[in-house]
């Protein structure tokens, strides 16, 4: 039996509020994270992802509080990322009620962190978040044509995005959260070529993110190899509902969780 496709709203949280911009800039307030999380749970979201975009020390304590409050009200799996640098950070988030933790920049600086986390907490708890973009003109060429970026897509990490996903799998992560920085907030559809290339390179689940603008954008991402589809602003501002996305996915011949 095919595994049901997961539909995941993503909430970027800054100082205890949900924010959304294009390519992480021009952030607009999109509401209270716990209220939004409860709404998405009621609307049929399969999971939720919180990304802490404040990632300062003050922001950290606030984020743990948001996770605690959310876990009290919401009973679907919760992934939390942003500023995760150590096993201690992961331990705190899991104790607060997160089910999974996504790791990004800190793993680029120290890849063995992924192995440490996977061995200590289990692969199912560790998500590698890859902020990928097409190599810009004049950039360092990469075999796949896609590079890993840091700092909200503004800096190149100088490594190939597809090879980095493969390395993450080899180091024991359970999923890849693949975010197209070219697509982030643009609503022009997912980067299907990026999804295909990563899908062919890894056997663990791939969550596609970046570019969703309408319900019809989701089935092509699944056809390209995504096991789960993630979006943010179209859900927060009420442009698209989770049930509309699921209807499109079912109409295209895929299974969803009812």
UniProtKB/Swiss-Prot annotation:
The UniProt record lists the EC number as: 4.3.2.10
Q: Which GO terms describe its cellular component?
A: cytoplasm
**Alphabetical UniProt keywords:** Amino-acid biosynthesis, Cytoplasm, Histidine biosynthesis, Lyase
The pathway that the record names for this protein is: Amino-acid biosynthesis; L-histidine biosynthesis; L-histidine from 5-phospho-alpha-D-ribose 1-diphosphate: step 5/9
Top-level lineage group: Bacteria
A GO BP term here is: L-histidine biosynthetic process
Tell me where it resides: Cytoplasm
Q: What is this protein called?
A: Imidazole glycerol phosphate synthase subunit HisF
């Amino acid at each position: 039996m095919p595994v049901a496709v997961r539909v995941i709203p993503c909430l970027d949280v800054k100082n205890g509020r949900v924010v959304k911009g294009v390519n992480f800039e021009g952030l607009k307030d999109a509401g209270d994270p716990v209220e939004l999380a409860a709404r998405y749970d009621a609307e049929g979201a399969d999971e939720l992802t919180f990304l802490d975009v404040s990632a300062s020390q003050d922001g950290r304590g606030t984020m743990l509080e948001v996770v605690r409050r959310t876990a009290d009200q919401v009973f679907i799996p919760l992934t939390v990322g942003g500023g995760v640098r150590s096993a201690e950070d992961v331990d705190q988030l899991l104790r607060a009620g997160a089910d999974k933790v996504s790791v990004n920049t800190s793993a680029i600086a120290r890849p063995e962190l992924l192995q440490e986390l996977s061995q200590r907490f289990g692969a199912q708890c560790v998500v590698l978040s890859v902020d990928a973009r097409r190599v810009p003109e004049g950039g360092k060429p990469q075999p796949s044509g896609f590079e890993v970026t840091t700092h909200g897509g503004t800096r190149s990490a100088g490594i190939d995005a597809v090879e980095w996903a493969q390395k993450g799998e080899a180091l024991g992560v359970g999923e890849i959260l693949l975010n197209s920085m070219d697509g982030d907030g643009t609503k022009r559809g997912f980067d299907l070529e990026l999804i295909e290339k990563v899908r062919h390179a890894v056997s663990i689940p791939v969550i596609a993110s970046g570019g969703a603008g309408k319900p019809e954008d989701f089935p092509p991402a699944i056809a390209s190899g995504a096991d789960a589809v993630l979006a943010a602003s179209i859900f927060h501002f009420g442009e698209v509902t989770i049930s509309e996305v699921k209807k499109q996915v079912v109409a295209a011949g895929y299974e969803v969780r009812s």
